[in-house]
């Protein structure tokens, strides 16, 4: 969430910065609400000061010997009571305005970083670097064809169980998924991340705090009778691990590696990636999440991206790093690097991780602060997939496919899977 004082006092700045995202905004209404709230706050503070003055005067007169029931003292007390009533009315009006203001602020995305490249959409994103040599060939299969040959997952039966865009991993497929999760978690925890396995059901406050609500309500699965939603990413519950907390600066950074199933309705993606593991309603992911001091967030962004890259490098999967332009940024992000893994069968790069710096955007929504010698201020947060497990499996199948129908696995994964290849059963 944006700083309401900044919106109130510098609406042109906010409009210009969000214009870099391709948004056209009229902040007049929001600015008016913010100014009304400020005026009420000033009136309330003035009345409270007057009430305090009257209270002190009553106390002084009684100490000086005045009768507590004397008319002058009674009149002062009456004035004090009237002020309390006026303050109560103003506080109620303030609460109503605050709710309206917060509702509007929650709908505004984060401001893009000054370092973020300008652009309208994904066509203006910029490649930063590549790693590995992409495998190419005319006869290479896409991952779902390989999976069918090896009987790695069930699609048709999953539709019977649930609906489309679900899969049931079977045999070697389930085993490989489990191996990948354990490998990713072990790699990250060996670098100092603390492992987290959070709830997969989260409340509205958690989704609001991370930035998924209110904008992405249609993308999420919601329980009918409870204030609970299926989490779209572990970023949501991990953000709220420290909601309404003050974290001492000497405890930062806090670095978490969280595995969770993720659930997304994928509204608006009809007809896209209907086969295989790329776009599912339910998938597994290992999420990296940092709480950092505001002075260190830029360096942390480089590191969290490198940590996500380390998984791809260990698995010998060629990839490229793309920096998103201002028009393609996610709602909560101020700057993002996407990691795109090469899929030889598809002959294309596909996103497998987004590593984003959110500044104080999520912290303001979630009231997460830090305290040092300079005082108390909002913390900065960062997140990155480390990695999306299903897409990693897809890349492994396409990269390791052999002419005999088997799939050769990278050496780093062999201790977790138990052998060096997938073979027809």
Swiss-Prot record:
Residues 117-131 have a biased composition (Basic and acidic residues). It is an enzyme of class 6 (ligase). It catalyses: tRNA(Ser) + L-serine + ATP = L-seryl-tRNA(Ser) + AMP + diphosphate + H(+); tRNA(Sec) + L-serine + ATP = L-seryl-tRNA(Sec) + AMP + diphosphate + H(+). Pathway: Aminoacyl-tRNA biosynthesis; selenocysteinyl-tRNA(Sec) biosynthesis; L-seryl-tRNA(Sec) from L-serine and tRNA(Sec): step 1/1. Residues 43-68, 108-131 are annotated as: Disordered. Its EC number is 6.1.1.11. Keywords: Aminoacyl-tRNA synthetase, ATP-binding, Cytoplasm, Ligase, Nucleotide-binding, Protein biosynthesis. L-serine binds at residues 233-235, 287, 385. One of its GO terms (biological process) is selenocysteine biosynthetic process. ATP binds at residues 264-266, 351-354. It holds the Pfam family tRNA-synt_2b. It is found in: Cytoplasm. PROSITE patterns: AA_TRNA_LIGASE_II. GO terms for cellular component: cytoplasm. SUPFAM superfamilies: Class II aaRS and biotin synthetases, tRNA-binding arm. One of its GO terms (molecular function) is serine-tRNA ligase activity. Catalyzes the attachment of serine to tRNA(Ser). Is also able to aminoacylate tRNA(Sec) with serine, to form the misacylated tRNA L-seryl-tRNA(Sec), which will be further converted into selenocysteinyl-tRNA(Sec). Belongs to the class-II aminoacyl-tRNA synthetase family. Type-1 seryl-tRNA synthetase subfamily. HAMAP family: Ser_tRNA_synth_type1. PANTHER family: SERINE--TRNA LIGASE, SERYL-TRNA SYNTHETASE. Consists of two distinct domains, a catalytic core and a N-terminal extension that is involved in tRNA binding. Homodimer. The tRNA molecule binds across the dimer. This is Serine--tRNA ligase. It comes from Prochlorococcus marinus (strain MIT 9303). The gene is serS.
